[in-house]
A protein has these predicted regions:
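Glycine-rich phosphate-binding loops of nucleotide-dependent enzymes
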Residues: 1-235
């Protein structure tokens, strides 16, 4: 479904991604784990067209993606960035509708809005509330809901648990599981490696801009070096 081949990305003189290749198959949850500065967010930004890459290619259904974020959204790829980036001065409802700004199918947009409210009842309760007054957990729900409103096939989800209390982290990962049940495919970047690996089918480890390990989430979780580096265990 989504293939990244030998991606090379530079920030000025910094070689941020060094020949990264990954694959995401339809219906999967694939996670990228790694430390801060490893290049995880850079990878998602390159896939979604926000960063130009010097070499390599990104294929979606065997067709090379354009370096144009709006066109990529139209093709069925939604990027939910780190930090939520909601429209703080708009209402919850208007934030959600901003996610559908490239769509023309008004009836289906209304259906998707109601489906989003079903997935996030809290957003329905607060649909007229100004988004900037929501709690951190509610803002993360709003960011995910807005991403769903573009009617994507695949969702690129960057650090969804960042800054959330443990109980809300569990809620967010339960929501991710529910989204997969809706038939969506997810590429997940997440510093909470334990939670990410517990929900993913497959995983890649990204270190200093390079993929150093890949395999099933179960295999990665059992790797002693990964357990020590990312899961807080030396066993």
């Amino acid at each position: 479904m989504l293939k990244v081949n030998n991606l090379q990305v530079y920030y000025g003189g910094i070689h941020a991604l060094r020949g990264v290749s990954i694959e995401v198959n339809q219906g999967e949850i694939v996670t990228i784990i790694g430390s801060n500065g490893a290049g995880k967010s850079t990878l998602l930004n390159a896939i979604s067209g926000f960063l130009k890459y010097k070499e390599g290619e990104v294929l979606y259904h065997n067709t090379k993606l354009p370096l144009n974020p709006s066109k990529i959204v139209k093709l069925g790829i939604s990027h939910i960035p780190e930090g939520r980036l909601i429209f703080a001065n708009l209402s919850v409802r208007d934030n959600l509708l901003m996610g559908s700004y490239l769509r023309k199918d008004k009836v289906k947009i209304h259906e998707d809005l109601e489906n989003t409210y079903t997935l996030f009842p809290r957003l329905k309760e607060r649909e007229k509330q100004i988004a900037g007054t929501l709690s951190g957990g509610e803002q993360q729900m709003l960011a995910i809901g807005r991403g769903l409103m573009s009617s994507p096939e695949i969702i690129l989800l960057d650090e969804p648990s960042l800054g959330l209390a443990p109980l809300l982290v569990k809620t967010v990962f339960d929501i991710i599981a529910d989204i997969r049940k809706m038939g969506k495919t997810l590429l997940l970047v997440e510093q909470n490696a334990y939670k990410a690996l517990s929900i993913a089918d497959r995983a890649y480890v990204l270190e200093q801009g390079k993929i150093t390990l890949e395999g099933s989430a179960k295999e990665i979780s059992a790797n002693p070096k990964i357990r020590e580096a990312y899961l807080g265990s030396k066993k």
